[in-house]
Regions:
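Short, well-ordered beta-strand segments enriched in hydrophobic/aromatic residues
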Residues: 90, 225-228
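Pseudouridine synthases involved in rRNA/tRNA modification
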Residues: 1-32, 80, 195, 204-207, ...
């Protein structure tokens, strides 16, 4: 494979090379980064270095990745929290930490693996072999409602609603700091970060991205917020809240790098979903409670 070229930013100064690679390349763990360095597949400014090499900032880093192993989505008996199900759609409350579909680095244990087992071959094929039935996605460390289609007609009908912004998705989150206004809208385009492939960013010329938010409650140093997506870009709420100076609590990518004790992901939960049913054309409105980690964190910041 052709080497991937990365530029170490000034923010990467004093960061170990293996940690830099793990944070810059999708699906790459720190141990995998270490093996690449030790096998000579990584060069900094054209020369091989050790895994403990600390970046000065500004270096050119070339990484040659091995050919990815083929990934196949197979049914797995993984428990699902099914919120709604009929012959056309299934809506699941996904736990934080679960990846939506298989990919290199996450070949199994995903929501798709669980859906294949639960639905026994009745998922739409429009999303392809690795994403059967998947109409939209939510991040691995985000919990909450996600809808999947059981046939192609349902998939097309739901995808059309997603495209014209009539499939409504509501989230709740805890953000760092106190939002001054009671409500607002972030209208800022999002694209891949220019130097960090694992991150998205507000970038001029990026894809349109609109998030509407309103304050639920304010606490010392934090705000409980409800967000409604008008568009659905990758990491949209996380990027937009960080962009206005209020990153989501527990988000180590767009907020503080230090993990929050008692929190395994970020405090972001897809709490509500509203759509027109693909067969009856009636409105279906669903909600699910906040996960235990989220409610415990609310109790903690109230004190």
């Amino acid at each position: 494979m052709e080497p991937i070229l990365l530029r170490a930013s000034e923010e990467s100064k004093n960061q170990r090379l293996d940690a830099f690679l793990a944070s810059s390349l999708d699906g790459l763990t720190r141990s995998q980064a270490t093996r690449l360095i030790e096998s000579g597949e990584v060069a900094v400014n054209g020369r091989a270095v050790s895994k403990s090499y600390k970046l000065a900032g500004g270096e050119d880093v070339a990484v040659t990745l091995p050919e990815p192993e083929p990934v196949e989505a197979v049914p797995q008996d993984i428990p699902l929290d099914v919120v709604y199900e009929d012959a056309d759609v299934i809506v699941v409350n996904k736990p934080s930490g679960m990846v939506v579909h298989p990919a290199p680095g996450h070949p199994d244990g995903t929501l798709v693996n669980a859906l294949l087992y639960h639905c026994v071959g009745t998922l739409s094929g429009i999303g392809g072999a690795l994403r059967p039935g998947i109409v939209h996605r939510i991040d691995r460390d985000t919990s909450g409602l996600i809808i999947a289609a059981k046939n192609d007609a349902a998939h097309q009908y739901l995808s059309a609603q997603l495209a014209d912004h009539t499939l409504a998705r509501t989230y709740e989150c805890i953000v760092v700091g106190k939002l001054r206004e009671d409500r607002g809208t972030v209208d800022a385009p999002i694209a891949r970060h220019p130097t960090d492939r694992k991150r998205m960013a507000v970038v001029a010329g990026g894809r349109e991205a609109v998030t509407h938010w309103e304050v639920i409650a304010r606490y010392p140093g934090y705000t409980h917020v409800r967000c409604r997506l008008e568009t659905g870009r990758t990491h949209q709420i996380r990027v937009h809240m960080a962009y206005i100076g209020h990153p989501i609590l527990g988000d180590t990518v767009y907020g503080a790098k230090k993990e929050v004790p008692g929190l395994t992901g970020q405090c972001l939960h897809a709490v509500g979903l509203r759509f027109l049913h693909p067969r009856t054309h009636e409105v279906v409105e669903l909600s699910c409670p906040l996960p235990d980690e989220f409610t415990r964190m609310l109790q903690k910041i109230r004190k």
